[in-house]
Curated annotation (Swiss-Prot):
Its cofactor is thiamine diphosphate. GO terms for molecular function: 3-methyl-2-oxobutanoate dehydrogenase (2-methylpropanoyl-transferring) activity. Heterodimer of an alpha and a beta chain. GO terms for biological process: branched-chain amino acid catabolic process; response to nutrient. It comes from the Bacteria. It holds the Pfam family Transketolase_C. Its EC number is 1.2.4.4. Keywords: Oxidoreductase, Thiamine pyrophosphate. It catalyses: N(6)-[(R)-lipoyl]-L-lysyl-[protein] + 3-methyl-2-oxobutanoate + H(+) = N(6)-[(R)-S(8)-2-methylpropanoyldihydrolipoyl]-L-lysyl-[protein] + CO2. The branched-chain alpha-keto dehydrogenase complex catalyzes the overall conversion of alpha-keto acids to acyl-CoA and CO(2). It contains multiple copies of three enzymatic components: branched-chain alpha-keto acid decarboxylase (E1), lipoamide acyltransferase (E2) and lipoamide dehydrogenase (E3). This is 2-oxoisovalerate dehydrogenase subunit beta. Signal peptide: none annotated. The gene is bkdA2. The keyword Oxidoreductase applies.
C-alpha cells in the first residue's frame, strides 16, 4: 500500500516494522525533535503500554517526558487539554478505545471547542491514541470501534491507519498538527499483515511479517485518502482492518474493485471519493463498527448527495452487527470477505 505524497526529510534507510514498532518509532522521533512533546497514559511508562507501543521510551527520555497516569480517562484527557493550551504537545494513550467514554466531556466540550471559545487564543495540539476493534477476543469492553462518535464533533480530527508506513507518517503529522486528534489503531493489525480471513493474536511476543518503513522522520498528509487498489467496476470506501477484507473480497470475486483507504476519517478526502464513484458508478462501504448511525451512514449520504446522477446501483453498506461485540463469536461478528464480496456482487447485478 502506498501513502500519497509522503513528506520525507531526505533519503533514508528502511526497516521491516510492525505497526507497533512504527508507532513507537514515530513517538521516539518526536520526543527527540521537540522538547514540548510528552507521552503519558495508563501503563505507558515503565511497562511500555499494554501492547508495548511505548516500550523503552521512558528509559530513554525520562519520567518527566514519558510517564504513567492514574486509571482516570477523564483526568488523562483533562490534563492533556491543559498541557496543550499552555504550549506542550501531549500524546496520550487510552488503553482501549472502549475506555474513552468517561472522557467524553473533556474531549467534546474542552479539547474540541477551546480554540473556538477563545477566538484562537488557545489551541490544543494533543494526539489521543486508542487501540480499537477486535482481534484479541476481548468481548464488548475491549473491541469497540467508536469512530462515529468523534467524526461528528466539530474541532476534532479522526485518523485510522491500516499499515505500518501510514501509521508512523500519520502519527508524526498528527503530533505536529495544532488540532486535537483521535488516532485510532486497529488491534488486529498491530503485529503484522492481515489477509482478511484468519484471525491472529496481537500479543507483543507474536512474530509476523512486517512492512518496510523509513527509519527517520517523514509525514503522511492528513485529510488525504489512498487508492490502494485501482479499479473500474466499483468503488469500495473503507479504512483500518477492513482494507484487507476488501482486498480479499476483490480477489475472491474477481471484480475490478477500486479500494480507497480513507485514512483520515474527518476531515474527509471527499474529492477522491467523488472522483472514484463518478468513474465506477457503484459503491460499497465497509467498516467493522456497528451499522446504525455508524460512519458508513455518513459516507452513504455524501455519496448520494454528490454522485446521485452517476450511480448505476444502490449503495451497499457492510458493517458489524448492531449488537455488543461478542467474545467467543468474534469472527461471526466481524464482517469478513464473504459478506463484503456478496455486497460487491449485488451492486454489479443491477
Amino acid at each position: 500500500m502506498n501513502a500519497m505524497n509522503p513528506q520525507h526529510e531526505n533519503a533514508q534507510t528502511v526497516t521491516s516494522m510492525t505497526m507497533i514498532q512504527a508507532l513507537r518509532s514515530a513517538m521516539d522521533i518526536m520526543l527527540e525533535r521537540d522538547d514540548d512533546v510528552v507521552v503519558f497514559g495508563q501503563d505507558v511508562g515503565y511497562f511500555g503500554g499494554v501492547f508495548r507501543c511505548t516500550e523503552g521510551l521512558q528509559k530513554k527520555y525520562g519520567t518527566s517526558r514519558v510517564f504513567d497516569a492514574p486509571i482516570s480517562e477523564s483526568g488523562i484527557i483533562g490534563a492533556a487539554v491543559g498541557m496543550g493550551a499552555y504550549g506542550l504537545r501531549p500524546v496520550v494513550e487510552i488503553q482501549f478505545a472502549d475506555y474513552v467514554y468517561p472522557a467524553s466531556d473533556q474531549l467534546i466540550s474542552e479539547a474540541a471547542r477551546l480554540r473556538y471559545r477563545s477566538a484562537g487564543d488557545f489551541i490544543v495540539p494533543m494526539t489521543v491514541r486508542m487501540p480499537c476493534g477486535g482481534g484479541i477476543y476481548g468481548g464488548q469492553t475491549h473491541s469497540q470501534s467508536p469512530e462515529a462518535m468523534f467524526t461528528q464533533v466539530c474541532g476534532l480530527r479522526t485518523v485510522m491507519p491500516s499499515n505500518p508506513y501510514d501509521a508512523k507518517g500519520l502519527l508524526i503529522a498528527c503530533i505536529e498538527n495544532d488540532d486535537p486528534v483521535i488516532f485510532l489503531e486497529p488491534k488486529r493489525l498491530y503485529n503484522g499483515p492481515f489477509d482478511g480471513h484468519h484471525d491472529r493474536p496481537v500479543t507483543p511476543w507474536s512474530k509476523h511479517p512486517a512492512s518496510q518503513v523509513p527509519d527517520g522522520y517523514y509525514k503522511v498528509p492528513l485529510d488525504k485518502a489512498a487508492i490502494v487498489r485501482p479499479g473500474a467496476a466499483l468503488t469500495v470506501l473503507t479504512y483500518g482492518t477492513m482494507v484487507y477484507v476488501a482486498q480479499a473480497a476483490a480477489d475472491e470475486t474477481g471484480l475490478d474493485a477500486e479500494i480507497i483507504d480513507l485514512r483520515s476519517l474527518w476531515p474527509l478526502d471527499l474529492e477522491t471519493i467523488v472522483a472514484s464513484v463518478k468513474k465506477t458508478g457503484r459503491c460499497v462501504i465497509a467498516h467493522e463498527a456497528t451499522r446504525t448511525c455508524g460512519f458508513g451512514a455518513e459516507l452513504m449520504s455524501l455519496v448520494q448527495e454528490h454522485c446521485f446522477h452517476h450511480l448505476e446501483a444502490p449503495i451497499e453498506r457492510v458493517t458489524g452487527w448492531d449488537t455488543p461485540y461478542p467474545h467467543a463469536q468474534e469472527w461471526a461478528y466481524f464482517p469478513g470477505p464473504a459478506r463484503v464480496g456478496a455486497a460487491f456482487k449485488r451492486v454489479m447485478e443491477v
